[in-house]
Amino acid sequence: MAKSIIIQAPALCFLSLLGFAYSESRFFVEGKVYCDNCRTQFVTKLSTYMKGAKVSLECRNREGGTLIYSSDSETDKSGTYRIPVDGDHEEEICEIALKKSSDPDCSEVSKDPFLKKSARISLTKNNGISTPVRLANPLGFMKKKPLPECAKALRELGMNPDDVIQ
């Protein structure tokens, strides 16, 4: 009896781990959308998070850029979105992009060719991240005109407002 337990226990552990390793992957992409009240294209103390903004997740083939997976989401009252994603997308480039603003006065997306307009995320178990949650960088829409208090807020950060505000 004792010998059979000694043999069965490691076998059971091994089979459990094997099943876990080959289980279907499920990820959750989380991020925030903000209104860039200072047109700096980064979060400041004057930025506000946007309820009802729409974002899109797209995973494309690395070779030809063919769309493999797509999902849309909307932010909650804290400006946060959460997109469930089934499957491992190790061989694809996955990015979150702004789709639609919930505020007509804060709906501009930068046209600067040097700026990234999306947040790239890794949706695979083979990257050393142990949790299924993937955090994307914050994405922001810009206000049409910066708030008057932006210059002071930027000086507090040690920045020259004329160099930063677009």
From Swiss-Prot:
PROSITE patterns: OLEEI. Keywords: Disulfide bond, Secreted, Signal. It is found in: Secreted. GO terms for cellular component: extracellular space. It holds the Pfam family Pollen_Ole_e_1. Residues 1-23 form the signal peptide. Disulfide bonds join 35-106, 38-150, 59-94. InterPro entries: Allergen_Ole_e_I_CS (IPR006040), Pollen_Ole_e1_allergen (IPR006041). It comes from the Eukaryota. Belongs to the Ole e I family. This is Olee1-like protein. It comes from Betula pendula.
